[in-house]
């Protein structure tokens, strides 16, 4: 394809959140897009389970966080959630969080309620400390949006910017665990638990996860937790329809066996030329975007004869993965009125429960778990006067290292008994007699149904050396016209994060494969960041603690001024000190991921 010629066609492998979103974006740019999906449904993990008796379950995600990223996706495509008949229902309270003695805490976006609840546990100055913690979460949130979720990291050289690196280190606290960081603000062990468990959204222990991820609970407490009427898949179904209006074609029940290339011509990198289906059919295209699990893709779909792919696949196999889950989907003959839409049951042995998952890849003896009752906020999820209940129990991922796998049937029975006993002990609800039908997803289910390596439901982990420029690239190693979108590539896991990644991937494709000076048909990340910086540079802390707090040591000086002052010092030092830092990071990256 000549450099001046735009790609006419694209194949997307996988109809998960990222594949659906990038398909619509490329179609808006004028590309003829075909999406291939091995299952008979779209949405990937973000799909629905329906029973003949009229119950509906969210198979995967059930909490809609970071609503701004969803709205941004729809607006970039020339529409809105409301225009596409997506109704978001806010959950009040956010959760009920149950402790082992039957006491509970119910976080909410209402600060007056939070003041009363927090001071019960933390004393008279507890709410002030909570506001300070919330302000820091806002800082993590805004910095991440601007410098991580709206920015591509095509190589380690992307970090060769002293202002960026110092911003990330100063503003995101990446080398301090969220558990330790929370201890700076909360005196009681229980409040530390309340404000750290959300790292499980990233498939990580709060004792290992960077403090950066307090942005998740900031989002919950500042923006709320939402649920789309009709199920989480309603959002992705709307994106499918938007894409179809622009010409995107979906082929379900269509498995892909390999990505094809031209083999490389005249000493150039091989280019992706299409795919071969499991039935042997060959489909040609100018470019290929893979939304399948990235570790699975490198091991099974990309040609191993291309230099570096086999070696990189082996490296990915040894990267730290997120957890898996045993998920129960229960149809009830009545209503579980003791349960809210979202319920968290925290283990008494909090740290030990995470160690069992992430260090021993096992089921904890006393697990923390999540209960979702979609029919509490959206009655259409179950027949009248009945409830649909989902119990998600985090567990270790499959080993796949030559060691014997755990006895998962026994662990499923143990998990079920533990969940039912804990619910009854803490709430008084005897759930077992109400269950009329059960569906179970185990780590093996996640692996086989969605091609998730090791059954890890959230892809690769999100520790420091698995994010930013250290996370797998959005473009395939050693190939042209082959790209990725999804949980294990940049910027990371979770539906809103993957939607942000779809924008990053689409913009990279337009930059690298379209003629120069081609106008991107939406507000680009660069343009959005510039606008955000203009609007937010002078924000100040408010009484509610929602605005970024000043870190200035000089009375009367705003945080943005102090930060700019720090940047001036950084600029003065960068000519001598920073090249050494970049060199050291490059050596470390080579030792960890290349050698």
UniProtKB/Swiss-Prot annotation:
Its cofactor is NAD(+). Keywords: Carotenoid biosynthesis, Membrane, NAD, Oxidoreductase, Signal, Transmembrane, Transmembrane helix. GO terms for molecular function: phytoene dehydrogenase activity. Residues 1-23 form the signal peptide. One of its GO terms (biological process) is carotenoid biosynthetic process. PANTHER family: PHYTOENE DESATURASE (PTHR43734:SF1). It catalyses: 15-cis-phytoene + A = all-trans-phytofluene + AH2; all-trans-phytofluene + A = all-trans-zeta-carotene + AH2; all-trans-zeta-carotene + A = all-trans-neurosporene + AH2; all-trans-neurosporene + A = all-trans-lycopene + AH2. One of its GO terms (cellular component) is membrane. Its main location: membrane. Induction: The expression is subject to photoinduction. Belongs to the carotenoid/retinoid oxidoreductase family. The keyword Transmembrane applies. It is an enzyme of class 1 (oxidoreductase). This is Phytoene desaturase. Phytoene desaturase involved in the carotenoid biosynthesis pathway. Converts phytoene into 3,4-didehydrolycopene via the intermediates phytofluene, zeta-carotene, neurosporene and lycopene, by introducing up to five double bonds into phytoene. Is also able to desaturate 1-hydroxyneurosporene into 1-hydroxylycopene and 1-hydroxylycopene into 1-hydroxy-3,4-didehydrolycopene. Gamma-carotene and 1,19-dihydroxylycopene are not accepted as substrates. Neurosporaxanthin is synthesized from geranyl-geranyl pyrophosphate (GGPP) through several enzymatic activities. It is found in: Membrane. InterPro entries: Amino_oxidase (IPR002937), Carotenoid/retinoid_OxRdtase (IPR014105), FAD/NAD-bd_sf (IPR036188), Phytoene_DH_bac_CS (IPR008150). The keyword Transferase does not apply.
